[in-house]
Amino acid sequence: MGWPLDAAEPIGTEASGRRQLQGVDWHRRNPACRRARMVAHGRDRQVRGLGEREAVRAVRAATAVGLLVLAVVLAVAGYDLLQRRHAILRNFPIIGHLRYLLEAVGPELRQYIVTSNTEERPFSRDQRRWVYTSAKGSNTYFGFGTDNEVEQASNYLIVDQATFPLPRPAAEVNDLPCAKVMGAARGRRHVFRPPSVVNVSAMSYGSLSGRAVEALNRGCASAGCLHNTGEGGLTPAHRFGGELVLQIGTGYFGCRGPDGRFDLDRLAEVAASAPVRAIEIKLSQGAKPGLGGVLAAAKVTSEVAQLRGVPVGRDCVSPSAHTAFSDADSLLDFVEGIAAATGLPVGVKSAVGELGFWQELTRLMRDTGRGVDFVTIDGGEGGTGAAPLAFSDHVALPFKIGMSRVYGVFAHAGLAEDVVFAGSGKLGLPDNALFAMALGCDLINVEREAMLVIGCIQAQRCHTGRCPAGVATQSPWLARGLDPASKAERLASYVANLRHELLQLAHACGEPHPALVTTERLEILDGHYGAARATEVFGYEPGWGLPSAADCAQLRQLMGRQSVAA
């Protein structure tokens, strides 16, 4: 309560000053005011005390964290100085780890920042963009023209279009059945015409996560194409509606007896339990021929180990060769035994090295009446979950050379029209797929392209079990990021778009189906302003690469009915 001032007395006069001082003195002498001041002063001290204690605690916490960080840094530095494996770390403790960090994220940095649209490998940015946009159902067109130096490019494909092409197929038309009926030439009980020329190649559960395999199987069911199980066997992740090609590897996973050897009864039982349309015997793989399959220890979880019958947490290495047969003759006995027990078409998958095996195989097929129903040629540039670099880079012929040589062996033996040929090894792009079909492929198997569709970012960590996209991993945390239902839709969209663009290319060449496009329509640039037809480059004779006359006529009828229906 202040001392009242005279309203008439101007502020700042001597009298007003005396009255203000008297008011202050009165406040000091007043007991109530003194008590109020003491209470306020206590509160101030209490607040200041709380603030000081909080500050002390914060300082102590920061000091503890700092000491902990310092201890960790010193421990790492000590380890770096004492270890003997890495010279960089011995010479530059702590900061030397930056080198390994940059090395670890190098693929991602190059992918998004450094490289051009066409130079990255194994799939360039342009190729990945086409795959991704096809999967999303987005615009797959590119503007402004090609990025490629066409005239200076060596081994560059040019498609010779027809002057009077067929009408452009409607956007919704993408049905492309196989030109041949699988198993018909050998009279198998369960012959069938594969409904799609584009199918998903062998990628086993274990190498891929269960959610990834489920997404692929669901997508195949939607797209009406075949899903190869891979050598890991038929698992619960393969039972979501997609029709299957059951692969038998050298480890015989899923069809082995207690002794680890092949069990025909077990195979027949497994094949009858799911929509298996064909059985593929894996002789070798393009990325690592001469070696068996390798599943890194990080991927051998308890579930994978139980399905394969192998120890948990240890590298699962398949033998380099089969124990059920040892040459072409015993292989054909093995094939015929499986076909008799299951009624299914049976074929082989192989990389291409020596041609002697193929010559012996075709001789026996011609002379004995035994034979394979299909042959899958896997190019040396094909994918793998894990392989030695020397094998991936230098063992086995690339697809186009290998395919043309094997096809030539079958053609000279008069058997090319009786066998369905499938190809794999970076064929999931329209131009590569058309090239393969002109060389005689009836089916195109896509592998890494399918992985890109369901989330792969080409991080190239498949062999570590730490795939960041949840595709090639067994980590539950990483795999949970992959939603099978949505990724299945993307796979179906990708397959449909690839078939549609293949159909567009065929129509541009004046043919209703890509299986009818021959090597005469393809030219290969030599990088020196010259070109040669693929017929000459690969030594093809007239009619090679085409189905039989009867199959061609039937295929034209099928495509004609599809065109009318559209």
Task: Locate each region found by the language model.
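Conserved, well-structured core domains of diverse proteins
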Residues: 57-221, 225-228, 232-242, 246-258, ...
